[in-house]
Regions:
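Active-site flanking loop/helix segments enriched in acidic
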Residues: 64-96, 132-135
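His-Asp-centered metal-binding catalytic motifs of divalent-metal-dependent phosphohydrolases/nucleases
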Residues: 94, 119-136, 148, 171-177
Length: 285
């Protein structure tokens, strides 16, 4: 495929509106994660890749992942066992957030941002980054991410991903482990940003993963959902999630945004406004 054509600069208000639209049908009228996946790839100009191309096999992998996540989510939801946070809606959130980061990157002429294979890879990673997540957090650091990578291997093989492509998927998913996020942002801060480099793409993946939890329009409901998910295994940690002090810790140490796209969208300004408001409330409590 040729490079993706020029794109208009997205606005963070439009991202918030897109996330609201995802929530309207959830969960009873949910159209399905495969439809969300197809819509974002159409929005990014990936609708008709050449058969046998890297884009074609990557999107085949992404669709297969989306279908399996949807099937698993429907089954677990019917049993009352779908995680309250790490569910199909979270995957859809991250696909939409990644779409806005990619569109902004393209509008900024970030290196690699208009390469169809890079864009397809980014979408596939978001579709699979929490593959068949069991819910909860009582695991060793990186265990859930490693499990997702392991469980994705047969799907990557079936789709014909090369060893190099599988390694990119692995590296980017492992970068979303909370203990790894700060390091990956520091790793690329002194270099020109190029999405063809795995660590730069990994930064975008970590940003898309927590963006909906950062935006004030969706943060509260997502924090409550995560607390519900944790409650059975770690009730004390679940209660602490809802405290303003914990929100402050999340904004200052976990919600990291350093890519050109995230900076242009104004994510750090969004964070700063929340931090100042919470600090003011705590001082006057």
């Amino acid at each position: 495929m040729d490079d993706i054509s020029e794109m208009t600069m997205p606005r963070i208000q439009d991202l918030s509106a897109s996330l609201r639209n995802l929530r309207r049908p959830w969960p009873n009228q949910w159209p399905g994660l495969p439809l969300v996946f197809d819509r974002v790839l159409q929005e990014l100009g990936l609708g008709n890749p050449r058969k046998g191309s890297a884009v074609h096999r990557l999107l085949g992998f992404g669709r297969a992942v989306s279908e399996l996540v949807e099937q698993d989510g429907v089954k677990r939801h019917a049993q009352g066992q779908e995680p309250a946070y790490h569910n199909r809606l979270h995957i859809a959130d991250t696909l939409v957030c990644m779409t806005y980061l990619l569109k902004t990157s393209a509008a900024l002429n970030v290196a690699g941002a208009r390469k169809p294979a890079v864009v397809a890879m980014a979408l596939c990673i978001m579709a699979g980054h929490d593959f068949l997540h069991p819910g909860g957090s009582k695991m060793h650091p990186g265990e859930l991410e490693a499990r997702a990578v392991h469980d994705l291997q047969p799907l990557m093989a079936a789709a014909g991903l090369t060893l190099a492509e599988r390694q990119i998927v692995k590296d980017c998913i492992m970068a979303t482990a909370p203990a790894q996020v700060k390091g990956i942002h520091l790793q690329i801060r002194t270099r020109p940003y190029d999405l063809r480099q795995t660590d730069c793409l990994a930064v975008l993946v970590t940003e898309a993963d927590i963006m909906a939890s950062t935006l004030p329009q969706t943060a509260s409901s997502l924090t409550q959902s995560l607390a519900i998910e944790w409650a059975s295994q770690e009730p004390e940690a679940a209660e602490k999630l809802l405290l303003p002090q914990n929100r402050l810790l999340f904004l200052e140490h976990a919600a990291l945004f350093s890519s050109p796209a995230a900076c242009r969208l104004g994510l750090n300004a969004v964070k700063l406004r929340q931090v100042k408001r919470i600090e003011h409330e705590l001082q006057n409590a």
